[in-house]
Curated annotation (Swiss-Prot):
Taxonomic lineage of the native organism: Bacteria, Pseudomonadati, Pseudomonadota, Alphaproteobacteria, Hyphomicrobiales
InterPro entries tied to this protein: ATPase_NBD, Carbam_trans_C, Carbam_trans_C_sf, Carbtransf_dom, NodU/CmcH_Carbamoyltrnsfr
Record-level GO BP terms: biosynthetic process
EC number, as in UniProt: 2.1.3.-
Family of this protein: Belongs to the NodU/CmcH family.
Origin superkingdom: Bacteria
UniProt protein name: Nodulation protein NolO
One Pfam family hit: Carbam_trans_N
Keyword tags: Nodulation, Transferase
Job of this protein: Involved in 6-O-carbamoylation of Nod-factors.
A GO molecular-function annotation: transferase activity
Length: 548
């Protein structure tokens, strides 16, 4: 099996189609950058493959390097593109690719850098985006769409296939997918929810299963809630109670109504239920949720929770049965459960949905079915009863330093290190409480597996060096954070598991210094340079016995 073949299987075998065109397209793998095939029954017959030097993924990546972005930042530029005008650099981008006969194309990756260096002010990471950068983003997105449409039109006509499956990293370009949806080129489109390389594992497993005589049922994939389960209620409550100095915890007999009350009154909350999602999207089990109406909710979540660029859009989750009232869905389209398509917000509703309507009047919609996720459907429906709006703002439950939360522990950590107003875990409503120095001192500190302590000589001026202390994240000195010598010494004392209080006692620190170190630790914890967590029960008992 090869890279793009398993991409193709991951989409076609989950689509529910008996026959379809299958387009797998990404940055590269096994010296190719994609393939076009026809799926029929349990067989996928390749029509054409695309060499790595014609990679559309690399075409996108090579361009965004000059916008201060790197690998895996493609989605940021996709979100920036609607702020730009593609006319400005259309002729420039026309030099970077050719549309060939029979649906072929040629990409000139070597022309991109020199041309952009001559024509734009290159952006460094962290600098503001200018209108020039927005226009480059728009031209890039338009060029990608032109190439993909050119290829698909040819193969649609040549094969007569009326359905399409998409996989590969480029298939996560939701703007492109939305254009395909509205084009009418295909009667139905299925995009593998884990279109990136994680989906290759699924495709490989499906291929082997089919070869062993156990092909996947020809059914449409209903959901991807395949990750770790939250656990039983008793275990969840025990874990929450271990943070009792930091959290107020209340069990609700109607968690959907309680959460909806919070959001209807302006709260931005973490929502954690059941099994986590497979793939890159939070689809209602590991989500940050909020009222989709106030535009300031978008600004607030970007600034104080996600701590990311202010232009970045948020997605709506809408009840499946009500979605068409608020969004322009093509005829026959009712279910969009995986946030794979950007769709138009109805003009009359755009002003109402200020937090989820992008600058071009679109949104990356998730429709929610009562059958596939009853808990999430219930909370949206409860919000509808209070506001007449069957929609919530939904974004992944994480900060800018970590992936999406999985466990109760992850959820608590992210809740305590962001400005979320509340947390819902299973049937429990959780709020923050002001923690005392004693509460913080009762926690244990440890270094994550990817972090290490270093004391190094560093230039603080061209002619002056001094010794500095830092935590390195991974193996690169470029991914490091400076810490005080006092915190360095405390972290160096960690052996096994001990409370911060006992470490402070060993270092003979006064109260003022302890307060300073707790404040610094909380900042480092927010960036995941250290872990703070309750002591295990046995260790808590030992510390009580020793008087700490």
């Amino acid at each position: 099996m090869n890279h793009h073949e398993v991409h193709a299987v991951s989409a076609f075998a989950m689509s529910g189609f008996e026959q379809s065109l299958v387009f797998a397209i990404d940055g590269g793998g096994d010296f190719l950058s994609g393939l076009m095939a026809v799926g029929s029954g349990t067989v996928i017959a390749q029509l054409v493959s695309f060499p790595e030097h014609n990679s559309l993924g690399l075409f996108y990546l090579e361009t965004i390097r000059y916008l201060g972005c790197g690998m895996f930042d493609e989605y940021k530029v996709m979100g920036l593109a609607p702020y730009g005008d593609p006319d400005r650099y259309r002729e420039l981008f026309a030099q970077f690719y050719e549309l060939l006969d029979s649906g072929g194309y040629r990409v000139h990756l070597d022309r991109i850098g020199p041309a952009l260096l001559r024509n734009i002010q290159v952006r460094r990471k962290g600098m503001p985006f200018t209108q020039q950068h927005r226009d480059v983003s728009a031209s890039l997105q338009e060029a990608l769409e032109r190439i993909v449409f050119h290829t698909l039109r040819h193969h649609r006509k040549a094969t007569g296939m009326t359905r399409l499956c998409l996989a590969g990293g480029v298939a996560h370009n939701c703007t492109l997918n939305g254009k395909l949806l509205y084009s009418g080129l295909f009667d139905d489109i299925f995009v593998q929810p884990a279109a990136h390389d994680a989906g290759c594992a699924l495709g490989a497993a499906l291929m082997v299963s089919s070869e062993l005589g156990r092909p996947a049922p020809r059914e449409r994939l209903p959901d991807v809630y395949w990750g770790p389960d939250l656990g039983n209620e008793q275990a969840t409550e025990l874990e929450l109670n271990a943070w009792s100095g930091h959290l107020d915890i209340q069990r609700s007999d109607d968690i959907a109504s309680s959460a909806a009350d919070w959001m209807a009154n302006g709260a931005v909350i973490g929502w954690v239920q059941g099994r986590s999602e497979f793939g890159p999207r939070a689809l209602g089990n590991r989500s940050i949720l909020a009222d989709p109406r106030p535009a300031e909710n978008k600004d607030r979540i970007n600034a104080v929770v996600k701590k990311r660029e202010s232009y970045r859009p948020f997605a709506p989750s809408a009840l499946e049965e009500d979605a068409s009232e608020f969004f322009e869905l093509p005829d026959g389209t009712r279910q969009l459960p995986f946030m794979n398509f950007v769709v138009r917000v109805r003009e009359a509703k755009g002003n109402v949905l200020g937090a989820i309507t992008h600058v071009d009047g679109t949104a990356r919609l998730q429709t929610v079915s009562r059958k596939t996720n009853p808990a999430y459907w219930d909370v949206i429906n409860a919000f509808k009863k209070r506001t007449s709006l069957p929609i919530l703002l939904n974004t992944s439950f994480n900060n800018n330093a970590e992936p999406i939360v999985q466990s109760v522990s992850d959820a608590i950590t992210t809740f305590l290190t962001t400005d979320l107003d509340g947390l819902v875990v299973g049937p429990f409503l959780v709020r923050k409480r002001p923690a005392s120095l004693q509460d913080w001192s009762a926690l244990a500190a440890s270094l994550p597996p990817y972090a290490s302590l270093h004391r190094v000589r560093s230039h603080i001026a061209p002619d002056r060096q001094e010794t500095v202390c830092e935590i390195r994240m991974g193996h690169s000195a470029h991914s490091s954070m400076r810490i005080s010598p006092e915190l360095f010494e405390i972290l160096m004392r960690i052996e096994g598991e001990a409370s911060l209080g006992s470490l402070f006692d060993t270092a003979l620190l006064d109260q003022a210094k302890r307060e300073d170190l707790v404040k610094e630790l909380r900042l480092v914890w927010e960036l995941r340079g250290v872990r703070l967590h309750p002591l295990h029960a046995a260790c808590r008992h030992d510390n009580v016995q020793s008087g700490t």
